């Protein structure tokens, strides 16, 4: 059995790490490189960086900080933000990133996933999915351009359909960003995670809602996700990564202990 992964998420805007609630009202957390080094030193298995306004601004991620992160950490990291072409991805990977993630650009052009997978291999192609539960319809819908609350829009895709579509096109991993739960720290949406797990054959990463160590345990034990991504509980030092891993190991979760 592969070890489960603990993955801090760093949302980047204007060269700094920020964090919002339900993808809105972002506050500045701190500088990118020191935070990345701190999480690596604490025992994170990998890091994910989202340049949250790159897609909505029509630009690619700022590469200047990617190489600086690669110099100070020795764990894998994934970068997302406005990647629309093989050339965009190649540049980010050449600066030291281990994986690239596509979200809004893939919704605009689903063939991008296949082209990236064919060029770089599925192992480094992650698809992020920003999913919102609609109380009125009882359905999960995929949103686009979520880094800018003024440009966010609901797509025609229902989440489960898009999960299956991106796998067919070559996604090697899926990060499910559950927008309703984002930043509120009341637990991952286990109902949605289980539904996605049933149709997801590639590694699945849960994102949105972690507030306690028990929430991580529930995601691993009840929804069988491969990794759990979180931001605010790590940024605000509510949970220490080393202590979290010790807790999970004590609960029988296969986890890498530093």
UniProtKB/Swiss-Prot annotation:
InterPro entries: Aldolase_TIM, His_biosynth, HisF, IGPS_HisA/HisF, RibuloseP-bd_barrel
Pathway: Amino-acid biosynthesis; L-histidine biosynthesis; L-histidine from 5-phospho-alpha-D-ribose 1-diphosphate: step 5/9
Entry coiled-coil feature ranges: none
Catalytic activity from the UniProt record: 5-[(5-phospho-1-deoxy-D-ribulos-1-ylimino)methylamino]-1-(5-phospho-beta-D-ribosyl)imidazole-4-carboxamide + L-glutamine = D-erythro-1-(imidazol-4-yl)glycerol 3-phosphate + 5-amino-1-(5-phospho-beta-D-ribosyl)imidazole-4-carboxamide + L-glutamate + H(+)
EC number(s) recorded for this UniProt protein: 4.3.2.10
Pfam families with a match to the protein in the record: His_biosynth
GO molecular function: imidazoleglycerol-phosphate synthase activity; lyase activity
Subcellular location(s) per record: Cytoplasm
Gene Ontology terms: cellular component: cytoplasm
Matching SUPFAM superfamilies: Ribulose-phoshate binding barrel
Signal peptide: none
Active-site positions on this chain: 11, 130
Gene3D superfamilies noted in UniProt: Aldolase class I
Domain of life: Bacteria
Record flagged with keyword Cytoplasm: yes
GO biological process, one term: L-histidine biosynthetic process
Keyword terms: Amino-acid biosynthesis, Cytoplasm, Histidine biosynthesis, Lyase
Function, in words: IGPS catalyzes the conversion of PRFAR and glutamine to IGP, AICAR and glutamate. The HisF subunit catalyzes the cyclization activity that produces IGP and AICAR from PRFAR using the ammonia provided by the HisH subunit.
Stated family: Belongs to the HisA/HisF family.
Self-association and partners: Heterodimer of HisH and HisF.
Protein name: Imidazole glycerol phosphate synthase subunit HisF
Gene name as annotated: hisF
């Amino acid at each position: 059995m592969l070890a489960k992964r603990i993955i801090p998420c760093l949302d980047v805007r204007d060269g700094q790490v920020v964090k919002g609630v339900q993808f809105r009202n972002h506050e500045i957390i701190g500088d990118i490189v020191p935070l990345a080094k701190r999480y690596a030193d604490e025992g994170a298995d990998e890091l994910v960086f989202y340049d949250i306004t790159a897609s909505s601004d029509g630009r690619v991620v700022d590469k200047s900080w990617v190489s600086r992160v690669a110099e100070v950490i020795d764990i894998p990291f994934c970068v997302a933000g406005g990647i629309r072409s093989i050339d965009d991805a190649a540049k980010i990977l050449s600066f030291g990133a281990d994986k690239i993630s596509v979200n809004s650009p893939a919704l605009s052009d689903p063939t991008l996933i296949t082209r990236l997978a064919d060029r770089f291999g599925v192992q480094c192609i992650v698809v992020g999915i920003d999913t919102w539960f609609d109380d009125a319809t009882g359905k999960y819908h995929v949103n686009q351009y979520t880094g800018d609350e003024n440009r966010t829009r609901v797509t025609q895709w229902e989440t489960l359909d898009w999960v299956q579509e991106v796998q067919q096109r070559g996604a090697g991993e899926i990060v499910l960003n559950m927008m309703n739960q984002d930043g509120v720290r009341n637990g991952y949406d286990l109902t949605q995670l289980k539904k996605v797990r049933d149709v997801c054959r590639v590694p699945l990463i849960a994102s949105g809602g972690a507030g306690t160590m028990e929430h991580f345990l529930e995601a691993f034990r009840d929804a069988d996700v491969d990794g759990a991504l979180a931001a605010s509980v790590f940024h605000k030092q509510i949970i220490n990564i080393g202590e979290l891993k010790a807790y999970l190991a004590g609960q029988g979760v296969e986890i890498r202990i530093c």
